[in-house]
């Protein structure tokens, strides 16, 4: 109990120390410091994220978004005061920079300031009542024209940030961080400053937690960041081209209501393992990021934009300035081709004029993946007549054959299910066997350790250790020893899992790289060598053609309050 009390005292002291540092480094005369919140009135909660709660407050005649930073994220015994202090300095430096530049550009959400006292820390920013693009996607499907408009306005915001001195890298471009103004324009929000303040320097257990928070966000991360030694959780792994890649993923999200390849993962927990595995694999396999895979039913204009953004090499990926020019050129060429099409197909009668006008209006803001052509009523009637005639001309099928087909179909499904059930039972029995064996080993080791200690005591003091009080003490020691061994094993497994997920095992002095040739034991390949892996990859297509493993309602992904609201600025 004294140990827990001391640890809790250290943890509480750290968060209190953070507020004291804030109070010292933001004096009352600082333009970034909000001296008092007496004029603020709480209205409602907007959502809750990993690093705090976002609320709506009124300040006089205006509304503001207030982020209440959850200071318990610093209450961990692995935190170092020096590291937290250094991260706080970085946080204040970047926030001051953003506080200055956001007021000079109408494409960036305004950062109004920070309030801090001895108990709490608030971050104030501009409030936009229409929410984010992600909120809009929950309610409706965006047309191509709207998605391109939002894309261009986001490019303008990034162009401004990337050309500052020093440049500002957003690092978290996605639909949830694109806020919509009252005049249907985009403002860029959520620069992840609080996340950076909390993440760096965490212990293994906390770092694993943070990595899991990036599950869905990894779908927006550029390949060079995924394959870097620092990993996607480290802010230093991001350069300017990473924002361009994330912008392309956000464009796909606006068109399809989901980021690229989201529908191919059976569960969201699979995302880090699969993406990081492909990013650092040596067999040449990559996920396809081409227009024909991501948006095959979209217009030619959208497909050109998608192929323009998703260039794997960051050196060849266009910057914001080139991207603006090339997208405008694509749009201009597309409008010219539409005009030429209209001229080459003159209107012959009023009925054609009406249908052409309707078709043109719908094509301007078409939905990707939906039919954009309306057939005349006459064509629909003729199609119905042909379908009825075709149905009548079909011969009657053999009922006995249909019974055999249906029986075989359902029997195959039953056998498949029984196969899965059998394997599940075997895995369960194997898991129980390994668990019981491991626990038995821990208990046996603990027993022999305590037995050895009792033997040493008996030799030195000639005591009768078979008395009840000594037996009770020995039993307690066995339990404590067992718990200690089990805890050490769980910590080791947690660190191993973290290093596997982040591909950092090669940093260990005990790391042994994959051999060039495969290791074969009794005719069974136990380790696949690098050469065999490359040969296998050459026999396959360079890109993976994925088949959806699960069909789900993607609106559930968008209606996730735990991921934070649209107005969350940090």
UniProtKB/Swiss-Prot annotation:
Gene that specifies this protein: flr-4
Disruption phenotype: RNAi-mediated knockdown increases lifespan, probably via nhr-8 downstream up-regulation of genes involved in the xenobiotic detoxification pathway, such as cytochrome p450 cyp-35b1. Results in increased lifespan with less lipofuscin accumulation and better motility, independent of simultaneous RNAi-mediated knockdown of hsf-1. Delays reproductive span and reduces brood size, mainly when grown on E.coli HT115 and not OP50. Increases the phosphorylation of pmk-1 in a sek-1 dependent manner.
GO biological process: defecation; MAPK cascade; neuron projection morphogenesis; regulation of MAPK cascade; rhythmic process
Residues forming coiled coils: none
Residues the entry annotates as binding ATP: 46-54, 67
Transmembrane is among the record's keywords: yes
Compartments it resides in: Membrane
UniProt membrane topology term: Multi-pass membrane protein
Protein name (Swiss-Prot/TrEMBL): Serine/threonine-protein kinase flr-4
Tissue specificity comment: Present in the intestinal cells from comma-stage embryos through the adult stage, although the intestinal expression is weaker after the L1 stage. Accumulates at the cell membrane of intestinal cells, especially the lateral membrane intervening the intestinal cells. Also detected in the muscles of the pharyngeal isthmus from the 3-fold embryonic stage, and in a pair of head neurons, which correspond to the AUA neurons, from the late L1 stage (at protein level).
Transmembrane segments: 400-420, 425-445, 471-491
Record-linked Pfam families: Pkinase
Highest taxon above the source species: Eukaryota
Catalyzed reactions per annotation: L-seryl-[protein] + ATP = O-phospho-L-seryl-[protein] + ADP + H(+); L-threonyl-[protein] + ATP = O-phospho-L-threonyl-[protein] + ADP + H(+)
Function text: Probable serine-threonine protein kinase involved in the control of defecation rhythms. Required to increase the length of defecation cycle period. Acts in a cell-functional rather than developmental aspect in the regulation of defecation rhythms. Prevents preferential activation of the p38 MAPK pathway in response to the levels of vitamin B12 in different food types during larval development, thereby regulating the expression of cytoprotective genes, modulating life span and stress tolerance.
Keyword Coiled coil included in the entry's annotation: no
Molecular function via GO: ATP binding; protein kinase activity; protein serine kinase activity; protein serine/threonine kinase activity
Biased composition (Polar residues): 346-361
Protein family according to the UniProt entry: Belongs to the protein kinase superfamily. Ser/Thr protein kinase family.
Residues annotated as catalytic: 172
Cellular component per GO, a single term: plasma membrane
Major subcellular location class: membrane
């Amino acid at each position: 109990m004294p140990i827990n009390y001391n640890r809790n005292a250290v943890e509480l002291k750290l968060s209190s120390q953070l507020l004291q540092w804030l109070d010292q480094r933001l004096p009352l005369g600082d333009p970034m410091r909000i001296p008092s919140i007496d004029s603020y009135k709480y209205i409602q909660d907007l959502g809750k994220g990993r690093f705090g709660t976002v609320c709506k407050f009124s300040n006089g005649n205006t509304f503001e978004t207030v982020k209440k930073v959850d200071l318990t994220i610093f209450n961990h015994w692995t935190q170092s005061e020096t590291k937290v202090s250094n991260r706080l300095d970085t946080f204040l430096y970047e926030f001051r920079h953003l506080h200055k530049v956001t007021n000079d550009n109408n494409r960036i959400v305004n950062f109004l300031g920070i309030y801090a006292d001895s108990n709490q820390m608030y971050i104030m920013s501009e409030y936009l009542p229409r929410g984010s693009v992600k909120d809009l996607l929950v309610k409706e499907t965006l047309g191509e024209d709207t998605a391109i408009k939002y894309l261009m306005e986001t490019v303008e915001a990034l162009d401004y940030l990337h050309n500052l001195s020093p440049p500002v890298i957003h690092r978290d471009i996605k639909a949830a961080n694109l806020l919509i103004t009252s005049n249907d324009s985009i403002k860029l929000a959520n620069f992840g400053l609080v996340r950076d303040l909390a993440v760096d320097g965490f212990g293994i257990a906390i770092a694993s937690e943070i990595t899991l928070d990036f599950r869905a966000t990894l779908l927006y991360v550029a390949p060079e960041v995924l394959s870097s030694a620092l990993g996607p959780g480290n802010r230093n792994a991001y350069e300017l081209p990473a924002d361009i890649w994330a912008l392309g993923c956000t464009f796909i999200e606006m068109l399809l209501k989901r980021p690229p390849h989201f529908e191919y993962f059976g569960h969201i927990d699979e995302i880090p393992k699969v993406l990081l595995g492909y990013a650092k694999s040596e067999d040449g396999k990559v996920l396809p990021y081409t227009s024909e895979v991501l948006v095959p039913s979209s217009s030619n204009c959208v497909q050109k934009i998608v192929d323009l953004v998703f260039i794997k090499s960051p050196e060849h990926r266009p910057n914001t300035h080139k991207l603006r020019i090339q997208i405008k050129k694509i749009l201009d060429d597309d409008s010219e081709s539409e005009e030429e099409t209209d001229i080459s197909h003159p209107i012959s009668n009023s009925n054609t004029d009406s249908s052409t006008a309707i078709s043109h209006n719908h094509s301007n803001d078409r939905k990707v993946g939906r039919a954009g052509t309306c057939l005349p009523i006459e064509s629909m009637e003729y199609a119905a007549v042909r379908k009825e005639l075709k149905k009548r001309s079909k011969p009657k099928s053999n009922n006995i054959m249909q019974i055999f087909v249906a029986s075989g179909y359902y029997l195959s499904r039953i056998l498949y299910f029984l196969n899965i059930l059998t394997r599940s039972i075997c895995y369960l029995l194997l898991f129980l066997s390994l668990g019981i064996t491991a626990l038995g080993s821990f208990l046996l080791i603990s027993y022999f350790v305590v037995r050895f200690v009792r033997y040493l005591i008996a030799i030195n003091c000639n005591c009768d250790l078979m008395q009840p009080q000594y037996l009770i003490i020995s039993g307690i020691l066995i339990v404590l020893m067992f718990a200690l061994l089990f805890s050490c094993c769980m910590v080791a497994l947690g660190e191993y899992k973290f290093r596997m997920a982040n591909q950092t095992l090669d940093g260990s002095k005990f790391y042994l790289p994959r051999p060039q040739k495969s290791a074969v034991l009794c005719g069974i390949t136990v380790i696949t060598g690098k050469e065999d892996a490359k040969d296998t990859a050459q026999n396959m297509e360079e890109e993976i053609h994925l088949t959806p493993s699960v069909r789900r309602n993607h609106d559930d992904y968008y209606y996730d309050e735990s991921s934070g609201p649209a107005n969350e600025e940090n």
